[in-house]
């Protein structure tokens, strides 16, 4: 039987009750940023795009959004979202640490999601990946799965218009901006971001809801 200390260390793992929202438009380099800034932390990534792209490859469909394949893609996208939602529910059941990938263009959706997580006892944070429009459009062209330029431009503008509101929602201390225009050749940028993420992960969750859940789990494990 595990000791009280062993049980307590598991429940007080720094990644439990931590949620990082990821924001940035198409071509911002979010996937690369999240890999560099949260890799090795054990945070669970919630991203339906990864699942969707896997399904596209399996079905041998074009990543360039061929209009003739629209119906097939829609079916796979719906399936990917359902699978991702199920995974997220499983993560939430164990109150595991999360990275919720998104663009940041729908402020109300993010606000609602953050509120729901806080009601479960989560500390919520945001990593905002920022680029100029020119860089975003160029990177979008270079991606395997591109989006039409007009959609990329509209998305970039919507995301930029939400920066202030998002910073207010999460608070300055929980809002990390990554200026990702230039290649991080010396590694200093991502080292700085990684340290910020680590600092937030090390901070113990100190709200009543999380403490009550952990106390309950501890009692169950001691039976």
Over which residues does each language-model region extend?
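Phosphate-binding P-loop
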Residues: 10-17, 90-93
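Conserved phosphate-donor/acceptor-positioning beta-strand/loop module used by diverse small-molecule
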Residues: 105, 118-139
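Acidic, metal-coordinating catalytic cores used for nucleic-acid/nucleotide bond scission
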Residues: 101-110
């Amino acid at each position: 039987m595990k000791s009280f200390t062993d049980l307590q260390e598991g429940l007080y793992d720094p990644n439990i009750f931590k949620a990082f929202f990821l924001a940035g438009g198409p071509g911002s380099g979010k996937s690369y940023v999240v890999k560099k800034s949260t890799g090795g932390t054990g945070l669970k990534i919630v991203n339906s795009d990864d699942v969707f792209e896997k399904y596209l490859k399996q079905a041998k469909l074009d990543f360039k959004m061929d209009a003739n394949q629209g119906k097939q893609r829609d079916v796979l996208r719906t399936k990917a979202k359902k699978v991702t939602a199920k995974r997220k529910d499983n993560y939430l059941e164990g109150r595991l640490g999360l990275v919720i990938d998104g663009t940041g263009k729908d402020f109300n959706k993010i606000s609602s999601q953050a509120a729901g997580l806080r009601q479960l006892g989560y500390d919520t944070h945001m990593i905002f990946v920022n680029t100029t429009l020119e860089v975003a459009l160029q990177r979008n062209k270079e991606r395997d799965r591109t989006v039409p330029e007009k959609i990329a431009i509209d998305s970039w503008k919507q995301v930029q218009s939400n920066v202030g509101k998002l910073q207010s929602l999460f608070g300055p201390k929980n809002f990390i901006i990554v200026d990702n225009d230039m290649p991080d050749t010396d590694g200093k940028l991502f080292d700085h971001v990684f340290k910020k993420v680590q600092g937030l992960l090390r901070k113990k969750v100190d709200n009543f809801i999380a403490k009550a859940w952990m106390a309950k789990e501890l009692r169950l494990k001691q039976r």
